UniProtKB/Swiss-Prot annotation:
One Pfam family of this chain: Pantoate_transf
GO biological process, one term: pantothenate biosynthetic process
Cellular compartments per GO CC: cytoplasm
Protein name: 3-methyl-2-oxobutanoate hydroxymethyltransferase
Taxonomic lineage: Bacteria, Pseudomonadati, Thermodesulfobacteriota, Desulfuromonadia, Geobacterales
Amino acid sequence: MKKTKTILDILKMKSDGEKITVLTCYDYATAGIMDGCGIDMILVGDSAGVVCAGYDNTLPVTMEEMIYHTKAVMRANPKALVVSDMPFLSYQIDLATARLNAGRLIKEAGAAAVKLEGGLNVVATIEAIVAMDVPVMGHIGLTPQSLHRMGGYRVQGRKDEQAEKLLADARAVEAAGAFAVVLEGIPMRLAERITRELTIPTIGIGAGPSCDGQVLVIHDILGLCEKYSPKFVKQYVDLKPIMAEAINSYIAEVKGGAFPTEGHSFH
């Protein structure tokens, strides 16, 4: 029987030079498909607020929503390592609040690890959560919960001063005890340097091919997002017309009396 991946497996993948595959997931059915394909990590992202709930950004997402989505994913009994996002205001207020909410994602929702955004500014938070024996994944660069400070979704680290700040953030996140770090929306050469200097895995999203792993939003690779698709996204299939064809066929058959047939009925 295939064993469930742990953070030790993910760390070993970096040392072995094996690329780490990560996708977001928010529901039971998709988690089962994903896990059957052998994905290494599942990220229950606060991006659920955008792709599932229709919010303009991730800021409105609540702890209750993250627990709901994480529980749904965990019911598929995935062998992938499941990481749950800590939403905005779940860890920024104080360390006690951060510890409580991280613990809820593990105890109530069933995740194996949590992810939070920030660098030097969240070192104490990462340390406090790790001290509870809760694994933490960091997230630096383009951090969606900081979109107002950044003036929107902009590539970070193009200037030398910004690049050095991000390198310091990456080192700080590792030193604080994170087992991995997401690098989002940064120049590929900077991501390559960070990946080379850290002992923990880097998971890229819009950070080039040199990261130890890659993560994308599942709705993006399936062509299910109606909103703007960033440059770093690769759409592997366009499911929208396939879904529309099935729905249109259903509507036509019901309207025309072709469904249900006797074979779909009880006697």
